[in-house]
Regions:
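Repeated scaffold domains used in trafficking and secretory/extracellular systems
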Residues: 1-7, 45-55, 100-110, 154-168
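Beta-propeller blade signature
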Residues: 26-30, 74-86, 132-147
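Short glycine/acidic-enriched loop and turn motifs that connect beta-strands
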Residues: 19-23, 66-71, 124-130
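Blade-loop segments of beta-propeller domains
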Residues: 36-68, 75, 93-98
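Asp-box/WD-like beta-propeller blade repeats and closely related beta-sheet repeat scaffolds
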Residues: 74-77, 88-113, 122-128, 134, ...
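A short beta-strand motif characteristic of beta-propeller blades
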Residues: 1, 36-42, 88-100, 148-154
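Entry beta-strands of beta-propeller and related beta-repeat scaffolds
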Residues: 10-15, 57-62, 115-120
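Beta-strand-rich domains and repeat architectures in extracellular enzymes and scaffolds
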Residues: 1-25, 45-46
Length: 168
């Protein structure tokens, strides 16, 4: 998903869309009748767009960068926090995450509960013993008050872990 529509407190709307030709985010504002009232361009943080999320007080953008050299020191995922006027507040990033291509072959879903943002997305992983770069899920947890990553899961899960088991 590269385009997001969100309702604003005054009944108007804001559309956020990633655009590779504009090298960032296009933000469009619409009145309650969907007449365009303004636009803004927000420069991108990292070159690969993942997702956008709006809370009551802030906007968040998740971006990434390819890491085909399998460099554990390279920032591959970045979560950037903005105020409601699109002024950058801060960001936090994830390195050493078994990722060559963030957001590859899937989507980026984001939700917030309390102080915690959960990002569930995907990636192409480092080359495995069979010589392939497999695709898998990624989960990142961020304390959005401190803008610190508090947990992440980027490794291969045992096949049995991906099934729902029950006794019956």
């Amino acid at each position: 998903m590269k385009s997001y529509l969100t309702a604003l407190d005054d009944g108007s709307f804001m559309r956020v869309q990633y655009g590779s030709k504009i090298n960032g985010l296009l933000v469009e504002y619409y009145d309650k009748d969907f007449n365009l009232t303004g636009t803004k361009i927000i420069g991108k943080e990292l070159p690969v767009f993942g997702g956008f999320y709006a809370t009551k007080d802030n906007y968040y953008v998740v971006t990434g960068e390819n890491n085909t050299d399998e460099d554990n020191t390279k920032e591959v995922y970045r979560i950037t926090k903005y105020d409601k006027h699109w002024n950058k507040i801060t960001s936090t990033g994830l390195t050493n995450c078994n990722t060559t291509k963030p957001f590859n072959a899937g989507s980026c879903r984001i939700d917030v509960s309390g102080n915690y943002m959960i990002i569930h997305t995907c990636h192409e992983m480092y080359k495995s013993d069979d010589g392939y770069n497999h695709q898998a899920n990624v989960t990142i947890q961020v304390d959005i008050d401190k803008m610190k990553i508090t947990d992440s899961y980027t490794v291969v899960m045992d096949q049995r872990g991906s099934r729902i088991l029950h006794n019956g």
